[in-house]
Amino acid sequence: GFPHHALDAYLPKLVRNGYRVAVCEQMENPKFAKGIVKREVVEVVTPGVAISDKILDHKKNNYLLAIYLENEIAGLSFSDISTGEFHSYEVHQNDIPQQIGLINPSEILVAKKQKGILEPVIQKTSQSITITKIDDWIFTFDYGEELLTKQFNTLSLKGFGIENLRCGIIAAGANLNYLRETQKENISHLNKISGYNPSDYMVLDFSTKRNLEITFSMSDGGREGSLISILDHTQTAMGGRMLKKWVSARSEEHT
């Protein structure tokens, strides 16, 4: 624990090192408290669920990714709590490493029973991504569908383009559950979800991005000296994020 005024100094360091941080605040005036002052956890900050200006690079999305496997099909759902972006889709399980490289998440959620299968795949792609194990009952279709329809205030998921994605819905439910738990349900701006088609983009694997120094320099891993640092003359955070998406995964659409 540390004083509230030291939060901005310690929180970024802890989260960037992969720690989960529970922010606890006093809920009553110490002068009027009987005994120990009442305190409650008001927010849980993790690498994939952060909204603080001190932690985020606002020209880069901070994605939380959930992965669920069933019969060689991988359901993937990624979100950015700071922007309200929320997607879900399915691929063959052999394509998981490529998709992790495309999304570049800060944190990945997996079911406890699938950790042994997914952890080696994730770590082979990147050693720096935080892997969080979630209770298996959360990765179920009925729970995921109920949670999503309640969040979007709808009777079904028709119209979002994911109603036939069983594994995708399971992954999206786990993603949303994690956001609700860490943000204490303060996620009303997350009001829609959409499908995602990775075949619409030319995907570059991690080693190619590294060797071409597209988004980071090989010398120190920083942004300076990379292609994006030269191209980026955007004036807003949204513009910076959009440019990074275009450079990292070029659209296959020809106009």
Go through each PLM region and give its residues:
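Charged catalytic and DNA/RNA-contacting regions of genome-maintenance
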Residues: 1-252
